């Protein structure tokens, strides 16, 4: 019986060590940061048609894919509600890039407690393979960031998913 209890305690301790926690990662040289439950590795840098820097990363954990796209706008735009229109246009572009076939519609008006210039929106997507997505986009007129989580099949919305989607930090917040 003692051996069984010792083995049980060791296994429980091992499982606790395997539990994932949020860790903050630098988004390339953008000055922005994001919290992930898995290691996204080195952020890949590419350039958009207007020469804006585009940083991307994705990792998998708990049968979910966790990702981020961060665009450092070459020409900073407007802030406040007008910036939501630019963000919505970018999300529309991403729907095509990710083969999204249906969406719930943008939930606008999200703000960040410590950063008045930030505007955000959420949406729920389904792609051509039947994968379910939840996304949250942010902009401050200088950056556009899209945090996303998707699952093969049904995506269970959990506190963990929402914590991740709220885990973006603009350069100006540092």
Regions found by a protein language model. Give the residues of each.
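Bacterial Sec-dependent N-terminal signal peptides
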Residues: 1-22
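Acidic, metal/ion-handling microdomains and their immediate structural contexts
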Residues: 8, 70-72, 172-174
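Surface-exposed amphipathic alpha-helical segments
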Residues: 20, 28, 40-41, 83-102, ...
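Short acidic/polar N-terminal linker immediately downstream of export determinants
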Residues: 20-29, 47-49
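Signature of long, low-cysteine stretches enriched in small and polar/charged residues
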Residues: 32-58, 91-139
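A short acidic-to-branched-hydrophobic micro-motif
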Residues: 56-89, 145-148
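Solvent-exposed loop/turn segments at secondary-structure junctions
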Residues: 73-76, 130, 152-155
């Amino acid at each position: 019986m003692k051996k069984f209890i010792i083995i049980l305690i060791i296994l429980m301790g091992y499982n606790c060590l395997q539990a994932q926690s949020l860790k903050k990662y630098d988004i390339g040289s953008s000055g922005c940061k994001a919290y992930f439950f898995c290691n996204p590795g080195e952020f890949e840098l590419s350039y958009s048609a207007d020469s804006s820097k585009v940083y991307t990363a994705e990792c998998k954990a708990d049968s979910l894919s966790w990702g981020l796209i961060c665009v450092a706008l070459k020409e900073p735009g407007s802030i406040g509600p007008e910036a939501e229109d630019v963000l919505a246009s970018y999300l529309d572009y991403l729907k095509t890039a990710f083969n999204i076939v249906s969406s719930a519609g943008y939930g606008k008006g999200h703000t960040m407690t410590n950063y008045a210039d930030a505007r955000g929106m959420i949406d729920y997507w389904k792609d051509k393979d039947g994968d379910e997505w939840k996304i949250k986009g942010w902009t401050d007129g200088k950056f556009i960031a899209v945090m996303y989580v998707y699952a093969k099949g049904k995506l269970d919305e959990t506190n963990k998913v929402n914590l991740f989607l709220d885990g973006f930090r603009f350069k100006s917040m540092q």
